[in-house]
Structure formats: C-alpha cells, structure tokens
Regions:
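N-proximal low-complexity "stem/linker" segments adjacent to membrane-targeting elements
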Residues: 1-27
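Short beta-strand-to-loop acidic/aromatic patch adjacent to the donor-nucleotide binding site
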Residues: 98-110
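Active-site-proximal specificity loops/subdomain of glycosyltransferases
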Residues: 47-99
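Short, acidic, metal-binding catalytic loop of nucleotide-sugar glycosyltransferases
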Residues: 24-36
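Short beta-strand/loop segment that forms part of the nucleotide-sugar
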Residues: 35-46, 70-71
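Conserved catalytic core of nucleotide-sugar-dependent glycosyltransferases
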Residues: 112-198
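C-terminal catalytic/acceptor-binding lobe
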Residues: 172, 177-182, 187-243
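Cell-envelope/extracellular polymer assembly enzymes that use nucleotide-activated donors
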Residues: 6-10, 37, 208
Length: 243
C-alpha cells in the first residue's frame, strides 16, 4: 500500500503567542492524518531564547514531532514583514524538502483533529477551514466572498453579520479569500506563488496570497464543516488586554 505523502505543518510564531503555545502543540500531535512534520518559525526579536523555550516546552510535555526555528530579525522590520518572512521560510522548507503540501495553521488557531485529513481528501490546490476573529457583535468570519459588479469590477468583501450562518452549511465551497489561519496549500501552488507584502500598507501576506491565487486562476475552497477555535477571540481569558 502506498504511503500517504508527508505534509509540512507550519506557521510564524513569537513570544506574544506563548499563552497558547502548549495547546497548539498538543492539538497538532492528535491529527488523524498519519504523515506530517510540525516546524514553526519564531520571529521574536531576541537571540533565539524563545525558540529554545518552545522546544523545551514541547520536550517536557512529551511532544516529539515539533521544532521551533528562530531567525535573526531586523529591529526595523514591521510585524507584517516579519510574518511574511516566516511564511516564506515555511514555503521554502516545503519546496526544498519535497513536502506534498504546506498546512498553514496559525499559532493561535486550534483545529479539529481530522482537519488535515479532510482537507487533503478534498484534493484541491488551496483548501481551508473556517474560524472567527473577536467575539460578540464584533465577531467576524475570517473569509471573504467575491463580488462581480461587472467584467472590469471584481472585488472581495467580508460577510455581513449573520450572513455567515447561511454560508456555513457543511459543504465545500469556493471563496475569494480564506486567510492563512487554517489552510492546506499544495506544492504546485507554493512553487507558483511567493508570499509578499507591501511596505507601509496595512495588509498581511494572506491578503496578497488570495489575490495572487485569483490572478493565477487558482480556486480557493472552504470546507464549511470545519470550524476552528481562535484563541484571540477573547484574550482577557489569558490575562492579556491587547491584540
């Protein structure tokens, strides 16, 4: 029987996300998909001490399939730039080591343990699960739909309050943008699209990734049966009062 291909599970992280690091690590160790490596890129502005802390945290909790790699940051880099650099470290690692896919799971997103397996089964170039940002009246689905106003006026827009209820029906759907919080990207797409950002523009590389997929005629799919927990919905639970 052919062995399932190996998938890279990765994301940027930093000391700001240490409040949920252990939960994230433990979540990744329970995946039902049998063949994957977990390697994260720590962009904390230090000498590597936070990456060391994360690796020691994993070992002390019996977690063997986990590695945090630090890269030397430039103090002039913005958070957006640091995250984009980390995204590309993950992309390059997947390409150079011939992983079949990159499963990008943000460091504060906790997914159902069969998520990776189900996304792989869909056999799409780009396919992700859903999650929310914030809570209460500020809650927003981290996904966008595409609006065709005319042949020359194509835009994306967020779901309005309560519209997500109709969208999330358990089916697989095409979508304009799904972010990088919980998304499986195949090797062919990774080779074609590099993560990018624009200096002095308040947009993260996930926005440009979705735009570049559209320009390359790569459809983005959302499995609306996959709803993840997002550990920034209420940071007060973790003793934090910032976002």
């Amino acid at each position: 029987m052919n062995r399932l291909p190996k998938i890279l599970v990765s994301c940027p992280t930093a000391s700001a996300k240490n409040y949920t690091a252990l939960e994230w690590m433990l979540n990744t160790q329970k995946f039902t998909y049998p063949n994957y490596d977990v390697i994260v890129f720590d962009n904390t502005d230090d000498n590597g001490s936070n990456a060391d802390y994360l690796n020691e945290l994993a070992i002390s909790n019996g977690i063997l399939n986990y590695q945090a790699i630090h890269y030397s940051t430039n103090k002039h880099e913005s958070i957006i730039e640091r995250m984009c650099i980390s995204h590309n470290h993950a992309r390059e690692l997947a390409i150079n080591n011939n992983y079949s896919h990159l499963f990008h799971l943000e460091s504060d997103v906790i997914c159902p343990i069969d998520t990776l397996q189900n996304l792989y089964i869909h056999n799409k170039s780009v396919c992700g699960g859903l999650y929310y940002r914030d809570s209460g009246i500020s809650r927003k689905l981290m996904a966008q739909r595409r609006i065709y106003r005319s042949s020359r006026n194509v835009a994306t827009e967020n779901f309005l309050p309560n519209e997500d209820i109709d969208f999330i029906d358990g089916n697989l759907k095409t979508i304009a943008a799904i972010g990088l919080g919980c998304v499986l990207i195949d090797l062919k797409t990774l080779k074609k699209i590099q993560f990018r950002f624009m200096p002095n523009v308040d947009l993260h590389s996930d926005s440009y990734f979705s735009e570049d997929c559209f320009r390359n005629n790569i459809k983005i799919f959302a499995d609306t049966n996959i709803i993840c927990k997002h550990n920034n919905e209420n940071w007060d639970l973790y003793g934090l009062n910032w976002k």
